[in-house]
Swiss-Prot record:
NCBIfam families membership: prfA, PRK00591.1
Chief place of localization: cytoplasm
Keywords: Cytoplasm, Methylation, Protein biosynthesis
Protein's name in the database: Peptide chain release factor 1
Record organism: Lactococcus lactis subsp. cremoris (strain SK11)
Annotated GO MF terms: translation release factor activity, codon specific
Classification lineage: Bacteria, Bacillati, Bacillota, Bacilli, Lactobacillales
Cellular component terms per the entry's GO annotation: cytoplasm
Cited SMART domains: PCRF
PROSITE patterns, sorted: RF_PROK_I (PS00745)
Post-translational changes noted in the entry: Methylated by PrmC. Methylation increases the termination efficiency of RF1.
Keyword presence, Cytoplasm: yes
Function (record text): Peptide chain release factor 1 directs the termination of translation in response to the peptide chain termination codons UAG and UAA.
Length: 357
């Protein structure tokens, strides 16, 4: 472990020099790759440096206690310092083990969040809107940028489908566990008998794809330009600004009309399409590799029921880790930390167990 850490420190120092090299700075692709690598190593190096300081404290304290000639007060102080340092050493060793776990290369990326109303008609579409608000409020609490990319709104204010770009530090690492089927149990607004209904919305979290990672060839792309429309389908723009893009080999389609100009809609559409197409091919590759890179939290199946939101009991249950919290109102308002932290800890624990086998 220590040889690996020393190697990491050496690479971190090398990266610092490379990132100040004008030749590297002028190469955008290489500069971004090296910057990500440096950011990935930063916590490892800082924790290891702290660990070495603690080892030094332990060594110094033991040496002084072994020399003798100390009064009782000094002995007691050194013993307390030694005990504290040994406890800290154990904590840091566990932190280092977790930091050295193989890291998902997408963890530092922004994400495209896609939510669809599934089983349950209008109620499922309304619940999709509730989930969108939950993720938006959580994003705001993290200091992330939240931007609607594509929305198919129903007549009662829900969403058949909605996509958002969430940008900021470690977005994917925290929200990657949200992919799957989310089930809601509540009395719908349209229910006159007061009966509890069960509906479902699906969530898909895709790491945003950089331009240098995925480029769709023009021959594989169909672009349609049309007039943006508002509620009820009426035309709201005399200039054709809305953009529809279709990736012909896969049939994946995106439509963009949120922006006022055709160019802005085109830019957002290609960003969303790149991510969806990249994700499509990545999923095929993952299936071929027998889900090797899928999270240990759940099966990784995107249709898997991962969580239930029970309104009558104010209860949220994450079925993958057996977590139940009587805090539904709080969680849907964006206070998701307790759920997300539990998923991260569970995932790390499982990976450590696999590593120690």
């Amino acid at each position: 472990m220590f040889d690996q850490l020393e190697s990491i420190v050496g690479r971190y120092e090398e990266l610092g020099e490379l990132l100040s090299d004008p030749e590297v700075v002028s190469d955008t692709k290489r500069f971004m790759e090296l910057s990500r690598e440096e950011a990935d190593l930063r916590d490892k190096v800082a924790t290891y440096n702290e660990y070495k300081k603690v080892l030094e404290t332990i060594s110094d304290s033991e040496e002084m206690l072994g020399e003798g000639g100390l009064d009782d007060e000094m002995k007691e102080m050194l013993k307390e310092e030694l005990s504290s340092a040994k406890s800290q050493k154990e904590v840091l060793e566990e932190e280092i083990k977790i930091l050295l776990l193989p890291k998902d290369p997408n963890d530092g990326k922004n994400i495209i969040l896609e939510i669809r109303g599934a089983a349950g008609g209008d109620e499922a579409a309304l619940f999709a809107g509730d989930l969108l608000n939950m993720y938006q409020h959580f994003s705001e609490s993290q200091g992330w940028k939240f931007e609607i990319m594509e929305a198919n709104i129903t007549g009662i204010g829900g969403y058949k489908e909605v996509s958002a770009l969430i940008s900021g530090p470690s977005v994917y690492s925290k929200l990657k566990y949200e992919s799957g089927a989310h089930r809601v149990q509540r009395v719908p607004v349209t229910e006159t008998q007061g009966r509890v209904h069960t509906s479902t919305a699906t969530v898909l979290v895709m790491p945003e794809v950089e331009e240098f990672e995925m480029t769709i060839e023009q021959k594989d792309l169909r672009v349609d330009i049309y007039h943006a429309s508002g509620a009820g389908g009426q035309n709201v723009n005399k200039v054709a600004t809305a953009v529809r893009m279709v990736h012909l080999p896969t049939g994946i389609k995106v439509e963009m009309q949120e922006e006022r100009t055709q160019q802005k809609n085109r830019d957002k559409a290609i960003k969303l399409l790149n991510t969806k197409v990249f994700d499509y091919y990545q999923q095929i590759e993952l299936d071929k590799q027998n889900a090797e890179r899928k999270s240990t939290v759940g099966t990784g199946d995107r249709s898997e029921r991962i969580r239930t939101y029970n309104f009558p009991q104010n209860r949220v249950t994450d079925h993958r880790i057996g977590l139940t919290l009587q805090k539904l109102d709080s969680i849907l308002s964006g206070k998701m930390d307790e759920v997300i932290d539990a998923l991260i800890v569970y995932d790390q624990t499982k990976k450590l167990e696999e590593l120690n086998k």
